[in-house]
């Protein structure tokens, strides 16, 4: 049995719209807050902590579903994400950035929760792996195009942050409006259970997920901010670094998956965490910009390894 084409098209559009806004926001953030709001490590830490609050509260999505259908909720969340990104450049102050980051994060985390749920419900089991791979590829290609565009805009045109945030957020918001107006509300082939489940036997998975989240914040928050504040990386250089990361991920992701299949999850985890000890120790003592960039790329490869382990 085949998945209806309209459902696939909607999921693909969602997979494209989200990284237009998210990739722009994340790539520009560190340079923007340092140049326009004079952020230090303390302020960026507060901003990123506030940004994670909606992620922690993503379980509250089950309560919203008593009021909104999942498809509608996903599109509304995508629109909120786009709005938060569009407003970011207009509020270059400490509290303004806190507000827009939280607004963006609310849309992002609710959207990701709903999109994953819709994908599992709409895609037929025999087609799901291929179609999920297609959606991941669409999102990755969109991110690559965004980073390449950012590099061109800031390297050759010196465009202002405000217009880039407005453009990226506006595109995401516009795509959300298009999805709402152009697609019917699809029915689900499965019944959605409005409950949360925790199982004691999964405690190790919960613990590893917790530590993985903490490690991810070091990569997302500290490492990128260090590249800007300590080594003076420009927006175009950061965009280029993100571009390199995604190219490396594209080239090595399949090999990483094959490696895990050969050596097993246990050894893969040992390799990941030993490697991270070396990388984070390097972050503490590195004083050369190129070496810091190399550590950043290696860090991203270990992050790809962690993602592969999570999805096994």
Regions found by a protein language model. Give the residues of each.
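Short amphipathic helix-loop junctions that connect adjacent transmembrane helices
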Residues: 27-43, 221-238
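Helix-to-loop junctions at the C-terminal end of transmembrane segments
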Residues: 58-70, 154, 252-265
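Structural signature of the two symmetry-related core transmembrane helices
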Residues: 73-86, 267-282
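Helix-loop junctions at membrane interfaces in 12-TM secondary transporters
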Residues: 89-100, 284-296
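Cytoplasmic helix-loop-helix junction between adjacent transmembrane helices
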Residues: 106-137
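Glycine-rich segments within core transmembrane alpha-helices of 12-TM secondary carriers
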Residues: 132-148
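Conserved small/polar residues in nucleotide/adenosyl-binding loops
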Residues: 310-312
């Amino acid at each position: 049995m085949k998945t209806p084409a309209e459902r696939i098209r909607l999921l693909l559009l969602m997979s494209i719209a989200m990284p237009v806004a998210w990739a722009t926001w994340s790539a520009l953030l560190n340079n923007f807050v340092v140049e326009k709001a004079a952020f230090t490590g303390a302020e960026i830490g507060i901003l990123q902590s506030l940004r994670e609050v909606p992620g922690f509260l993503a379980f509250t999505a089950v309560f919203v579903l008593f009021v909104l259908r999942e498809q509608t909720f996903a599109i509304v969340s995508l629109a909120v994400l786009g709005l938060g990104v569009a407003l970011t450049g207009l509020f270059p102050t400490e509290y303004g950035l806190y507000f827009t980051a939280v607004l963006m994060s609310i849309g992002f985390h609710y959207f990701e929760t709903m999109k994953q749920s819709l994908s599992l419900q709409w895609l037929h089991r025999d087609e799901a792996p291929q179609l999920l791979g297609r959606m991941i590829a669409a999102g990755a290609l969109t991110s690559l195009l965004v980073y390449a565009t950012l590099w061109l805009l800031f390297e050759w045109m010196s465009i202002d942050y405000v217009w880039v945030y407005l453009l990226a957020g506006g595109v995401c918001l516009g795509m959300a409006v298009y999805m709402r107006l152009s697609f019917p509300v699809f029915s689900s082939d499965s019944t959605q259970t409005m409950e949360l489940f925790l199982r004691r036997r999964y405690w190790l998975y919960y613990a590893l997920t917790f530590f993985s989240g903490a490690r991810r914040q070091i990569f997302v928050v500290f490492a990128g901010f260090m590249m800007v504040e300590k080594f003076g990386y420009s927006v175009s250089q950061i965009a280029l670094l993100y571009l390199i990361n995604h190219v490396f991920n594209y080239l090595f992701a399949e090999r990483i998956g094959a490696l895990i299949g050969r050596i097993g999850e246990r050894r893969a985890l040992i390799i990941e965490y030993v490697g991270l000890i070396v990388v984070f120790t390097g972050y503490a003592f590195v004083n050369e910009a190129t070496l810091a960039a190399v550590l950043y790329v290696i860090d991203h490869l270990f992050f790809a390894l962690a993602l592969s382990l999570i999805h096994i």
